[in-house]
Amino acid sequence: MTPIAVTPVAPVDIIYDLKHTERATESSPVTLLDVFSRAVSQYPNHELSFITSSAHDSTIHTKTFAEFNQDVHALAQAMRAWGKPTGSVIVVYLTEHEDNMAAVWASLLAGYVPCLQPALSAQQAHKEGHVGHIKNLFSSATWLTNESGAEQVQSISGLDIHLLSELKASAEAGVDFQAHQPNSDDEAILFLTSGSTGFSKAVVHTHRTILAACHAKGESYGLTSESKIMNWVGFDHVAGSLEMHIAPLLYGASQLHVHASAILSDPLRFLHLIEEKSIQLAFAPNFLLAKLTRDLEKRSDLFGKFDLSSIKRINSGGEAVVSSTAQAFARTLKNLAKDGDASFVISAGFGMTETCAGCIYDPINVLETPPSYEFLELGTPVAGCEMRVVNPEDGVTPRPDGESGELQVRGPMVFVRYYNNPEATSSSFVEGGWYRTGDVGIVEQGKMRLSGRIKDTVIVHGVSYGIPELETYLQTVEGVTHSFLAAAPYRAPGQETEGFVVFYSPTFDLDSEDAPAKLFATHRALRDVSVKLITLPPQQIIPIPINQMEKTTLGKLSRARLVNLFKQGELAKHIDRAEELVSIARGASFVAPSTETEKTLAGIYAGIFNLSVGDMSASENFFELGGTSIDVIRLKREGESAFDLPEIPTIQILKHPVISSLAKYVDSLISKDASQEEYDPIVPLQLTGNKTPIFMVHPGVGEVLIFVNLAKYFQNERPFYALRARGFEPGHPFFTTMDEMVSSYAAAIKRTQAHGPYAIAGYSYGGVVAFEVAKRLEAMGDEVKFTGLINIPPHIADRMHEIDWTGGMLNLSYFLGLVSKQDANDLAPSMRPLTRKEQLEIVWKLSPPERLVELQLTPEKLDHWVDIAGSLIECGKTYEPASSVSVLDVFYAIPLRGSKEDWLNNQLKPWAGYSRAEPSYTDVPGQHYTLMDFDHVPGFQKIFRSRLEARGL
C-alpha cells in the first residue's frame, strides 16, 4: 500500500488568492472588514437574530445587518477614545452572542485585536493564575466585559477593565468615523486554547487565514445569500464565531444565534427553531443528537408535526459521532417531519482552534448510505486543506493507506503562530508546514476517521478537560495510594460519548475484612470528585494492587499501557474482584424490585441514567444517582405514560425519590386511594453524608425545583432539605402571616434535625424567612452556625406593597420563563384593566409551548400558582426585621434594578444591624434570577460550600 496525503479536488488558487492584493474587490474581500462592509452594503435587510442566556427571556431579538452596522460603528468610535495603540489586544469576556459579536467587530473597526475569553474557572486560584498569565502574555491587560465579568476579575491587580454597558452609554450613533484599514496578514482575532495541559495558548488567526477557511467552508456548505443558519456554540469558540458567523456573513446569509442553555435545557426547541426560522444549516454535537433522540424517538404524539423541509445539513463536531446515534437521530427526524419522504444530511467533521474550526467533512444521508464503522467517517478536506497520517515517533514518515498514525493538516486556514510563544509554535509544525493535531487517525480510500488522541485530554460534551488536572484531584481521595493513580480517556464500543477509566492502587488490602466497605467508599468518592470537576463519573474504576502497578523508569504510570491491558482483558480479574467487593458492600442494602410498579420505575430510572436494570435496587434514590431538575421532568413524563396516569405531581417525586417509596405513591394513584397528605414543608432533595444538613427556604414563588441542581453537589457530604410553601396541594390553605410560616418551618426543621448546630439559607424572599427561622431556633436554645441570605435585603415591605396581582403574575411568569423581562416590565399598565382570565390568556399566548409542556402547566395551575405567590407577598407587606442572629452570610448577584455596587452598599449591608458578628458579603456570578441556573450553579455551589466551611460546617 502506498503512503498518501489527501488534497482537495478543487485547486486552491481559484478559491482564494490574496498574495498580491491588499484591498478588496467586489468579488474577493481581503480582510474581515471588507466582508462586513460588503454584507451591509449588499444585504442591509438580512438579519442577525439572538436568543439570550436568560431562562426568563425566550424571545428572539433581531437586528438587520444595517442596524447592527450602526451599532458597532458607534461602539468602535467610543473604543477609539480609550487611546490604545493600533494593534492592541482587547480581551473580550462577555456572555451573550450579540454582545460578543458587537465587541469583536467594534474592536476590528477601531484597529484593535480582539481575544475571545471563554468562561473563567470558578476556582479562585485557577482563575487568578489564568488571568495573570493572559496579562503577562499580552504585556497589557485591557478587558471588555460586563458587570458580572468585572466582579470575577476584580481581585487581579493591573487590569484595565472597561464595561460594555458604559461603552454603549458613551457611544454616539451617526458620528463620522474612519474605520481602521488592516492588511490581509495582520492579526485579526485571537482564540484561547482550553489550557487542558497547562496555561492557555493564544492562537493567532490573520484576516488571510480566516477568510481562506470561510471561503472553503461556504463552498462545502453550499452557502448563498438566501441561506439561513442556526448556531448555539459560544462565540468564544471558533465554530461559533468563524464557522457559524463570519463564513455565513461572507455570503450574506441570515443568522440565528442561540445561547447554549436555551437548547440544552430544552432540546425540543432545536426543532422548533428550525421550523420557525426555516433554518438550512445547523450544528449539533454527538451528545445533543443522542439527547434529542432519547427525548423524541418515542414521542409518537409529535410524529408528523414538524415542517423540517428547510434543513439541508446538520454539522456535528467537537467529539466523535456514533454511527448508530446519527442513524437513530435521522430516523427520529423522519418520523417527526410532516414530509414522510424527507431526508437528512448529517456531516461529521474535524477541526480545531488552530484550523479555524472544521476543515474536514463528510456530509452523508446516513439512512440511504449506512455508515461502515462504529463512528462516522470525517471525510475529506475542504478546498485548500491537505491531510496526512504519519508515524507519531518521527512525525514525518507517512503511514500506508488504512493504517493509523498521527494526523497532520496544512493549508491557508491553519493558524500562523501562538501569540508570544515561539517554542510552542515551532513544536507544533514539522517540515513542509504540516501542523501536528495531536490526534490519531486513519485515512482509507481518501476518507479520514479518528481512532484516538495523543494528547492527555478527555472530551465531555465537546469540552476538553485535562487528564493531569483530573488526576491531581483524584489523588486526594482517601483510599488512593499517592502517585499510584492514572486516568485515561476511553470510549466503549457502541458508547455515544467519550468517557474515562480510573486505575489506582488502594491503600488497604483487598483481602481484608473491611475491604468491601473501604472500596465502596473510595469508589464513591472518586465518582463524586469526577462529577464535581468535569460533570462525568468514570466508566470504570479498577483497583490494582501496588505490587502489580508498573511504573516507567521515570517513575510514571503509563496510561497507554493500562488502557491496552484493559482493552485486552488483562485486568478482568481486578474488575471482577472490585465488583465482588462492591456487591458485598451493597448486599445489606440491595433490595430487588418486587412489585410490578417497582420494576417499571427501576426500568425508567435505569434508562434515565444509562444503567443496567439488574443493578437497580428498590432502595435507589433518584437524586443520589445524579438526577437533575430536567431529569425530574423526564421521570414525571415517562411515569405518567407508563402507568397511564393524568399526572404524577412533581412535588411527590421530590418527596419520594426512592423507587420503593415512589412506587407506593404511584400505586395509590392507580387505585385512586391517594388520601390527602398532611402538609409538610420539608422536601428532602438528597440525604447522604454526615455533615450538618442544609435547610434551604423557597424563593417568592414558593416552589423548590430550582434547588434540585444545587442539591446534587452535596451528595455524600451533607443532607440537603428544601422548604416548600403551603398551598400547592388541594386542601392546603395558604399562609396568612409571616409568623405562621416561620412557626411551621421551624417546627418542621426540628422534626427533621432535633438539635443544632443548624445551617439555614434562603433564596430571595426566602432569605428573610430563613433569618426569622434562625431567630426562632436560637430562641429555643439551639445553635445556628450558618444563616445564608441569597440576594435579598432586610427591608422588603416597600417592595411587597409595589406588587399587585398583575405585577405578581408577570413576575412569576418571567421567573418561570414564560415571558421576557421586557414583556414583564412593559405589559402591566395595559393589562391591569383586564380581568384575571384575560390577563392569563395574554401570558398563555406569549408562553413558549415547550416550556408549558416542561412545567406541565395549565391556565388553572398558573392561576393558582399566582395566588400562592400572592399569599407570600401579603405575608411580607407588614414585615420589618428586628433583633439579631449570631452571624449572617450574605450572597449577592446582579440585582433586578440598579448597579451591583449600590445594591451591596445601600440595600444589603444594613444586614449588619441584625447580626451579632460581622456578616460576610460574598459575590456570586449571575443575575438575581439566574444565579442558580444551568450555567451558574457549578460556580455557586463552590462559593456556597466555602462559606459553610468557613463557619466550621
UniProtKB/Swiss-Prot annotation:
Which GO molecular-function terms appear in the entry?
acid-thiol ligase activity; transferase activity
Q: Where is this region: Adenylation (A) domain?
A: 38-460
Is-annotated flag, keyword Transferase? Answer: yes
**Positions of the region Thioesterase (TE) domain?**
693-795
Q: Which InterPro entries match?
A: AB_hydrolase_fold, ACP-like_sf, AMP-bd_C_sf, AMP-binding_CS, AMP-dep_synth/lig_dom, ANL_N_sf, ATP-dep_AMP-bd_enzyme, PKS_thioesterase
EC annotation? 2.3.1.-
Instruction: State the pathway, as annotated in the record.
Output: Secondary metabolite biosynthesis
Q: Which residues carry this modification: O-(pantetheine 4'-phosphoryl)serine?
A: S629
- This protein's superkingdom? Eukaryota
Q: Where is this region: Thiolation and peptide carrier (T) domain?
A: 597-667
Q: Where is the Carrier domain?
A: 592-670
- Activity-pH dependence: Optimum pH is 7.6.
Give the UniProt record's GO annotations in the biological process aspect.
biosynthetic process
Q: Which UniProt keywords apply?
A: Phosphopantetheine, Phosphoprotein, Transferase
Q: Which cysteines are joined by disulfide bonds?
A: none
Return the broad EC class.
Answer: transferase
- How does this protein's activity vary with temperature? Optimum temperature is 20 degrees Celsius.
What functional role does this protein have? An L-tyrosine:2-oxoglutarate aminotransferase (probably invD) and atromentin synthetase invA2 catalyze consecutive steps to turn over L-tyrosine into atromentin, which represents the generic precursor molecule for the entire terphenylquinone and pulvinic acid family of pigments, which are widely distributed secondary metabolites in homobasidiomycetes. The first step catalyzed by the aminotransferase converts L-tyrosine in to 4-hydroxyphenylpyruvate (4-HPP).
Q: Which family does it belong to?
A: Belongs to the ATP-dependent AMP-binding enzyme family.
Name of the protein in question? Atromentin synthetase invA2
Per the UniProt record, the source organism is: Paxillus involutus (Naked brimcap)
Kindly list the organism's lineage. Eukaryota, Fungi, Dikarya, Basidiomycota, Agaricomycotina
Q: Which gene encodes it?
A: invA2
